[in-house]
Amino acid sequence: MPPHLYLSMHWTGRLTAEEQQNILDWIADERAKSSLSSDAIKSLKGEPIQPLPLKVALDERKVALGHKLFFEKLLSGDETMSCASCHDLTKGGTDQAKVATGIRGQQGPINSPSVYNASYNLAQFWDGRAKDLQEQAAGPVANPGEMGEEWDNVVKKLSQVNEYKNSFDALYAGKGLTKTTVTDAIAYFEKSLVTGNSRFDQYLRGNNETLTTNEKAGYELFKLNCASCHFGPTLGGGSYEKMGEKHNYFNLRGGELTEADNGRFNVTKDEKDRHFFKVPSLRNVELTFPYFHDGSTANLADAIKMMAKVQRNKDLTKDEITQIEDFLKSLTGEYKGKLVTKLNDKDVQ
C-alpha cells in the first residue's frame, strides 16, 4: 500500500517491522517503474540510485555553440572571466575554492556548485532561485560581484563577431543573437555535461566485479544514512533539506552567520525555509571540494563525518567513514569518454 494511504488510515499507529518492510518494498517497486532505471539490471532497478545515461541525444550544432559561449570571456565586464572560470570542467565542474572569485578579485558569498549533471536538478543555485539552466545562465553575467556585465553590452560585443552572428542566425532563425538565445545556447551545452559510465553505473548495469568489497559496504551504509536526501541518478538535486536536521550545523561550524547561510529563505522569505538548501549532487564528489554551501570543509572524510552528525545524529567510526568515502569515489564518471579525474584543458576546450 502507498505510504500516504496507510498513514492516512493509521495516523496514530506504529509500524511493525513487517509493515515497514512492506512500505520499503512498495518504494522499491515504484522506483523500478521509473524510466531512469530502464537500463539497470532487474535486481537493482529498485535502488535509490539510478545510472546516468551513456549518451544524451542533443543537437550537436547547438552544443558546439553553447560550448564556445561557456568559455567566452566577452561575457564578463572586464573580459577576464567566462562561465568556465568558476565551473572548470577539469575540476569536477567547480573552481575547487571555498567561495567563487568574480571580476577584479571580488570574493563571492558562496561555494560554486558543479555544472556537471546540473540538468537533473529541480532548480539551480544552492537556494533554487533559478528555475532552470537558462535562467541560471543569465544570473552570473549581470551580477556585479561575478562577471559584472550588462546583457545589452554582451549582445553588442558578441554580435560584432561574425562567427557568433552567423551561428545564431542559422540556429535561431528569426530570433538571431539576443540575451534569450545566448542563455539558451549555454543551457543547451550544459545539458550535454552528463558524466555517465562511472564504476557504480557499471555495477548497476550488472558488472558486479567493478566495485570492491569496501565500496559495496560503503554503499550499504550510504543507503541507511544518506539516500533519503541523496537519491536519483545524481544522488542529489531533487529536494531542499535543512542544513542541520539533528544538530545545529552553524554552531558546530563556528563563525558569524551570513546572508548565504539563510539558504532557501532568501528566495521565499518563508521562515520555514531558513537554512534549507538544494541537496547537492554527489557525482564526481571527490573533485568538488571544499564542501557545503560555505566551502567550510576541505576533505571528503570530514564532510561525511559532519553530515552524519548534523543530519542523522550518527557518530560514524573511522572504518565506516572510509567505506562511505570509497563508495562515493566510485561515482566519478566520464566526460567525452574520459574519467573526469583525468581531464585536462585540451580535453574540455
Model-predicted regions and their roles:
Residues 1-2, 115, 133, 168, ...:
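Bulky hydrophobic/aromatic "packing anchor" residues in well-ordered structure
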Residues 2-10, 303-309:
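Short helix/strand-capping connector loops at secondary-structure junctions
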Residues 7-8, 12-64, 121, 139, ...:
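Post-cleavage N-terminal segment of exported redox proteins
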Residues 10-17, 310-318:
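Short, flexible active-site recognition loops that position polar ligands and cofactors
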Residues 40-139, 202-298, 302-305, 314, ...:
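Short glycine/threonine-rich turn/loop motifs
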Residues 76-77, 179-180, 317-318:
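Alpha-helix N-cap/helix-initiation sites
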Residues 145:
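Central I-helix of cytochrome P450 enzymes
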Residues 320-322:
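Terminal end segments
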